[in-house]
A protein has these predicted regions:
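Metal-dependent nuclease catalytic regions and adjoining charged, substrate-binding loops involved
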Residues: 206-292
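Mg2+/Mn2+-dependent nuclease catalytic core
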Residues: 147-246
């Protein structure tokens, strides 16, 4: 649960990201909330590139590529380069890097002082590298499946399982000959074997919805920059135990928020968990500003 991971890592980030300015942009809201809203829209270059690779993937998913591997590879690379160019044009069109209306700005410009031209060059270079790696590793994926094999996972999916709503992030999922596959495209680093196993049960229950038996569903965690992937077979899962853990986490977060509101304590008095790398946090400069 990403919200729980943020809560455990840093209470400040939890409050800023999930609780402050959550109603969207309002020019009448206090200046401090306007700042928080702006900072929420800073994303590192790697996340921008991840979005581009996923977008290119889904743009290709509606076409029939069987027997046309070379054409698919050319199209995928063209999609990726086109999306990178669109992103750079959008960023260049901002009146300033901290425009309040939410084109996701570049974190390195804010935190590291990177100039815009360098950021744009990095977006292009990393996109091309990631696209070529993906083509090398999964270039035949669409050529092995027809559009009818794919499960619609271009957008976040939610569905009910018992009394719990399950949310699935975007990913590529397919069912063919009674087996299910899921390609989780992400930023896992070279050690993809350490990819979060806690995510598996979400996919498993989706596959169960489509009648796939335990042991006949595989999930591959793929890192877009190293080109490494790690595949797990999704067996049956103790959903009741997972649900209890999720509920306990929700109670802990809710009680902490309630106590914080009642006592009116200053969130800036809290400190990140030891070992947290604040250099990668979108709110780093905001914290510095508040601590000054």
């Amino acid at each position: 649960m990403s919200r729980w991971r943020v809560f455990a890592r840093c209470r400040r980030e939890f409050v800023f990201h999930y609780l402050s300015a959550r109603g969207g942009w309002d020019p009448e809201m206090p200046e401090v909330l306007q700042d928080i809203y702006r900072y929420k829209h800073f994303y590192p270059i790697d996340l921008h590139v991840l979005d581009i690779i996923k977008s290119s993937f889904f743009r290709a998913s509606g076409k029939y590529w069987h027997g046309r591997q070379d054409e698919y590879r050319r199209s995928f690379l063209r999609f990726a380069k086109s999306d990178a160019a669109v992103l750079v044009r959008e960023l260049a069109g901002l009146a300033c890097i901290r425009d309040p209306y939410g084109i996701r700005s570049v974190l390195e410009i804010e935190n590291e002082g990177m100039d815009f031209d360098t950021a744009a060059a990095e977006i292009y270079a990393r996109t091309e590298k990631a696209a070529l790696l993906f083509i090398e590793n999964y270039g035949n994926l669409f050529c092995e499946h027809t559009p009818l094999d794919w499960i619609g996972t271009q957008n976040i999916i939610s569905f009910s399982c018992e009394d719990v709503t399950i949310y699935l992030p975007r990913g590529a999922a397919w069912i063919k000959n009674g087996r299910a596959g899921w390609l989780d495209i992400g930023l896992y680093g070279a050690d993809t074997a350490s990819a979060p196993g806690s995510e598996e049960w979400r996919r498993y229950w989706l596959f169960r919805k489509y009648g796939v038996e335990p042991g006949r569903a595989d999930i591959a965690f793929y890192d877009i920059f190293s080109g490494e992937s790690f595949t797990r077979n999704i067996m049956d899962f103790d959903f009741t135990g997972a649900k209890e853990i999720m509920f306990r986490q929700a109670v802990i977060m809710r009680e902490w928020v309630r106590e914080a509101v009642q006592t009116g304590f200053d969130i800036m008095e809290t400190k990140p968990e030891e070992g947290t790398d604040c250099r990668k946090c979108r709110f780093r400069n905001f914290c510095r500003k508040m601590e000054a």
